[in-house]
């Protein structure tokens, strides 16, 4: 999973998933959920879907876990051809709907855009996006070049300062 490039700059919203495909012929959609557990995405409304750079609010008519994913029917999307236009769209919800992150936890959307510096104060770049790899999340940092840094609190990531917009890492800048 990738998160970041299409994320809204409006910090009032948090990306929680994306439309990943079609399901059936009546306009149902497959959803890849970024929430843990994955079915938590069904608890939030309205969804804000990004299509062609614009965000549109949509309400859930129905939704359920289906296999390893989620399938949903959204208001105003009743046909497969119409549903196909939404495949690939990001899903965001208003931040007020989500619980605040616990100590030492962060929403990915809060990390995107932070300046990344080493313990020695050398600037590596900015967090462009994050990747979910299974073993651990990975920060994609863009500066003079792109770097992939494991998001391991304490080992690699030493400090996250959202107020200052800084993420301090124990990382060799030549790596």
From Swiss-Prot:
GO MF annotations in UniProt: ribosome binding
GO cellular component terms attached to this protein's record: cytoplasm; ribosome
Keywords attached to this entry: Chaperone, Cytoplasm, Ribosome biogenesis, rRNA processing
Chief location bin: cytoplasm
GO terms, biological process: ribosomal small subunit biogenesis; rRNA processing
Domain PRC barrel: start-end pairs: 103-175
Location in or out of the cell: Cytoplasm
Function per UniProt: An accessory protein needed during the final step in the assembly of 30S ribosomal subunit, possibly for assembly of the head region. Essential for efficient processing of 16S rRNA. May be needed both before and after RbfA during the maturation of 16S rRNA. It has affinity for free ribosomal 30S subunits but not for 70S ribosomes.
HAMAP family per record: Ribosome_mat_RimM (MF_00014)
Subunit structure and binding partners: Binds ribosomal protein uS19.
UniProt free text on domains: The PRC barrel domain binds ribosomal protein uS19.
Name of the protein: Ribosome maturation factor RimM
Organism expressing this protein natively: Nitrosococcus oceani (strain ATCC 19707 / BCRC 17464 / JCM 30415 / NCIMB 11848 / C-107)
Gene name of this polypeptide: rimM
């Amino acid at each position: 999973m990738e998160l970041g490039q299409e994320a809204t700059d409006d910090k009032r919203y948090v990306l929680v998933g994306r439309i990943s495909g079609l399901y059936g012929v009546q306009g149902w959609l497959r959803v890849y959920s970024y929430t843990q557990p994955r079915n938590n995405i069904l608890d939030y409304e309205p969804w804000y879907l990004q299509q062609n750079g614009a965000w549109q609010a949509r309400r859930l008519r129905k939704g359920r876990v289906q296999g390893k994913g989620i399938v949903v029917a959204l208001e105003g999307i009743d046909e497969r051809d119409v549903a196909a236009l939404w495949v690939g769209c990001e899903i965001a919800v208003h931040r007020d709907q989500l619980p605040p992150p616990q100590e030492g936890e962060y929403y990915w959307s809060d990390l995107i855009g932070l300046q990344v510096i080493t313990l020695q104060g050398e600037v590596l770049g900015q967090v462009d996006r994050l990747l979910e790899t299974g073993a651990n999340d990975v920060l994609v940092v863009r500066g003079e070049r792109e770097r992939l840094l494991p998001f391991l609190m304490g080992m690699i990531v030493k400090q996250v300062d959202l107020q200052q917009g800084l993420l301090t890492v124990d990382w060799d800048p030549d790596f």
